[in-house]
Amino acid sequence: MGEIIQFDVLGLPAPQGSKSAFVVAGRAVIVDGSSKTGRDKHALWRSQVSDAANAARGKTQFAGPVGVSVVFYLPLPASDPHRTLHATRPDADKALRSVLDSLTTSGLVRDDSQVYEVKATKLYARDGHWTGASIQVWDASEDELRYRAESKAASRAKR
C-alpha cells in the first residue's frame, strides 16, 4: 500500500441530496431535491470535510487510483441509546458521495472517479464520541501494478 492520508472531521455528516429532472415548456429543468436547510447543512459539511482534507494532505495530490474508507459517527437517538449500528437515514451512499466530492474540492484527489475501492460504515457516536467522520485515503497504484502482474501471469498460464 502506498501513501495514506488519514483525518477526522468533526461535525454533522450531511448527505448529498438527489436531483430531480422534468420538462417545462419543452425545456429540461433540473432541481435539487433537498430543502434549503438540507442544502445549508450539506454545504457546511462539505466545507468541513474539504478543510480537514486540506489540512491533512499537505502538498499531496493523488493522481492515480485511490482507495477510500469512511466511518461516519452519527448522533445517538434518545429513543434507543443502546444501538450501535446506524441503519437509518442518511443513506450511506449519499453521505459518501458528499465526502468524495469534498476530497476533489480539497485537491487531495483530482477527480472522484479515481476511487476504485470504497468502504463506508455508519455508527452511532456512543460514550461521548464526537459526531463526524474518520476518513482514510490511500494511494492504490501498487494495487494496480499487482493486478496487472497477476493478470499477465494468468494469461501466460492459459497458453
Question: Which stretches of residues belong to each language-model region?
Answer:
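Acidic, proline/glycine-enriched N-terminal capping motif
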Residues: 1-159
